[in-house]
Amino acid sequence: VVVDAVGHGLLTLDDLERSHVRGFDFEAAWRAVEPDDVVTLIYTSGTTGPPKAVQLTHASVLFECRALQACLPYQSGGRMISYLPSAHVGDRVLVHYGASICFGQSVVSVADLRQIAAAMVEVRPTVFGGVPRVWEKLKAGLEAAGLRDPSQLPEAGKALVRARLGLDHCTLCVSGAAPAAMEVMQYFSGLGLSLNEGWGMSELSCFATVNPPGDIRMGSVGKALPGVELRLLDDGELLVRAPLVMKGYRDDPQRTAETLDADGWLHSGDIATIDGDGYVRIVDRKKELIINS
């Protein structure tokens, strides 16, 4: 099913909505849904290789949303911008399922990435997230305008810059999907916008770790979400066990078994360290590549 294209062999969303299946009972169908039923498929290559269809369930997505809500300032009535591809687990799960359905926030969708800056000023999001490349571009734009070191501005000046960015109402700035450069983190911290870096993957319904607000440690991806277990193998590979772990790869038992062991631990492929306070740092990749934008 495609949203905004037509072609041979494609079913458009409009056609799907207009279709009628004889004898289909919507009321009975939705009431028959169980927590372990698949709610969505996220296609991922795991950075390289043939695509895999990650099966996320109603239970795994709800666990992810509730765990994030327990430790981050997601307030009802807030505002978010959807601009990442909906194939991205962050946009689909955190924005459309989490912010809109679970948290009761308004979501404004922006199809043209060139309009993001204008949308930020118009929407004034209360939560704004992006991959590191987004934050790098915002930093580059401010530097091009002459703001080399925002930490030297008086508080009134910082507030003015935040307002011009459209982030003056933002209580949570998130960076994820790849490591953010330290200079980017420090730049926005100097502006009064602490980037909350987290770690996760499609197979984990998005985030498994985040930095606690008020206790952000730059260079780390934070601590495990409530209810999430972390473990390191002897080679440093980070393993995760929690209700947010995927059901498996659709119709691919071999690769499912390679990722999920018999005890329910998901093998992430990332090499990490965990300090005495529970903060995780990703230091290497056991296999494949890290995507940074």
Residue spans of the language-model regions?
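Conserved AMP-binding A3 loop
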Residues: 39-63
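Conserved S/T- and glycine-rich ATP-binding loop of Class I adenylate-forming
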Residues: 38, 44-47, 80, 85, ...
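ANL superfamily adenylate-forming
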Residues: 1-35, 142-164
